[in-house]
Curated annotation (Swiss-Prot):
SUPFAM superfamilies assigned: E6 C-terminal domain-like
Domain of life: Viruses
GO biological process: DNA-templated transcription; regulation of DNA-templated transcription; symbiont-mediated perturbation of host apoptosis; symbiont-mediated perturbation of host ubiquitin-like protein modification; symbiont-mediated suppression of host innate immune response; symbiont-mediated suppression of host type I interferon-mediated signaling pathway
GO CC, any one term: host cell cytoplasm
Quaternary data: Forms homodimers. Interacts with ubiquitin-protein ligase UBE3A/E6-AP; this interaction stimulates UBE3A ubiquitin activity. Interacts with host BAK1.
Name of the protein this chain belongs to: Protein E6
Species of provenance: Human papillomavirus 5
Length: 157
C-alpha cells in the first residue's frame, strides 16, 4: 500500500489549469455522454445521478480535483453547504437595490449565488430580488440571494 502511495501523481498548478471544471467538459474530454459520468460527492461520497450532474453544471459549480481524482457536490450537500456557510460566515444583509451601494458595482456585474441551493443567479433572478426588495446576504465575502426555484419554498410567488 505504501508503494502505491509513492507512485501517486501530484497535481501541479499547471495541471489543475488544464483539467475540466464542469461535468459536461469532463464528459467531452473523456469522449462519453454526461449520463455515463459517475462522479462522487466530495462531502457524502454518494455518486451524483444524472439530474444532479446536470444541476451541478446549471449551478455553475466547479469540479474539485484531488490529485487526479474528481469530485462534485450532490443536491443534498449543496443545501447543507449553503446552510453551513450562511450560519458560520454571515457578514451583512442589504435589501434590493442597496446591494449596488454596498458592493460598489451594478447589479449586472455582481456574482450572486442562491443562499439555499448555491445556484448562480441569472440577471432575471437578480432583478426580481431587487424589484421585490428581497434581501441579499454577504456570506464569506460573496453575495447570496434567492433563485427562482428556491423562492417557492418561501411562498413568495
Amino acid at each position: 500500500m505504501a508503494e502505491g502511495a509513492e507512485h501517486q501523481q501530484k497535481l501541479t498548478e499547471k495541471d489543475k489549469a488544464e483539467l475540466p471544471l464542469s461535468i459536461r467538459d469532463l464528459a467531452e474530454a473523456l469522449g462519453i455522454p454526461v449520463i455515463d459520468c459517475l462522479i462522487p460527492c466530495n462531502f457524502c461520497g454518494n455518486f451524483l445521478n444524472y439530474l444532479e450532474a446536470c444541476e451541478f453544471d446549471y449551478k455553475r459549480l466547479s469540479l474539485i480535483w484531488k490529485d487526479y481524482c474528481v469530485f462534485a457536490c450532490c443536491r443534498v450537500c449543496c443545501g447543507a453547504t449553503a446552510t453551513y456557510e450562511f450560519n458560520q460566515f454571515y457578514e451583512q444583509t442589504v435589501l434590493g437595490r442597496d446591494i449596488e451601494l454596498a458592493s460598489g458595482l451594478s447589479i449586472f456585474d455582481i456574482d450572486i449565488r442562491c443562499q439555499t441551493c448555491l445556484a448562480f443567479l441569472d440577471i432575471i433572478e437578480k432583478l426580481d430580488c431587487c424589484g421585490r426588495g428581497l434581501p441579499f446576504h454577504k456570506v464569506r465575502n460573496a453575495w447570496k440571494g434567492i433563485c427562482r426555484q428556491c423562492k417557492h419554498f418561501y411562498h413568495d410567488w
